[in-house]
């Protein structure tokens, strides 16, 4: 009898920096949407975004590791650091499936990214060969009746925290400790 695959969510992002919104969302998806684990894939570059204020790759990875160290269902990953750039999602997913055949991967994206999904490189191939889970974002509405069979709309709480807000608040010297995991906050104070 074949052992069932580990259901693993792929939560890719800049995590510039990781904050409590990322963590609460991932926690909710693990506990309420059937995922066994979530891997935080720290992205070195998003082909659809200008990254003029992107923090160092290794610092962002370190912050993710600090933030998730106390939750066994989360893993920090630098998998995309080792792929050619720009790293397109289809290449990442295909490489993950090849490297980890005992896992069933689900790509986790926000509703804002879902609306841009037709512009993604090889979007149709992603939908044909991979699972996608969409989480809600403020001011972006998705009609679940229009989604392809490989796509699931997760019913998660809306959390309006952004890494841009975090970076701006830190630059202004504001005390925003409750928006960040305590270990991340302490590391950034240094």
Curated annotation (Swiss-Prot):
Q: What is its EC number?
A: 2.7.7.18
Q: Which gene name belongs to this protein?
A: nadD
The pathway entry for this protein reads as: Cofactor biosynthesis; NAD(+) biosynthesis; deamido-NAD(+) from nicotinate D-ribonucleotide: step 1/1
Organism field: Phocaeicola vulgatus (strain ATCC 8482 / DSM 1447 / JCM 5826 / CCUG 4940 / NBRC 14291 / NCTC 11154) (Bacteroides vulgatus)
Record's keyword terms, sorted? ATP-binding, NAD, Nucleotide-binding, Nucleotidyltransferase, Pyridine nucleotide biosynthesis, Transferase
* One MF term in the entry's GO annotations: ATP binding
Q: Which GO terms describe its biological process?
A: NAD biosynthetic process
Task: Give the record's family classification.
Answer: Belongs to the NadD family.
Q: What is this protein called?
A: Probable nicotinate-nucleotide adenylyltransferase
* Record's catalysed reaction(s): nicotinate beta-D-ribonucleotide + ATP + H(+) = deamido-NAD(+) + diphosphate
What is the purpose of this protein? Catalyzes the reversible adenylation of nicotinate mononucleotide (NaMN) to nicotinic acid adenine dinucleotide (NaAD).
Listed NCBIfam families: nicotinate (nicotinamide) nucleotide adenylyltransferase
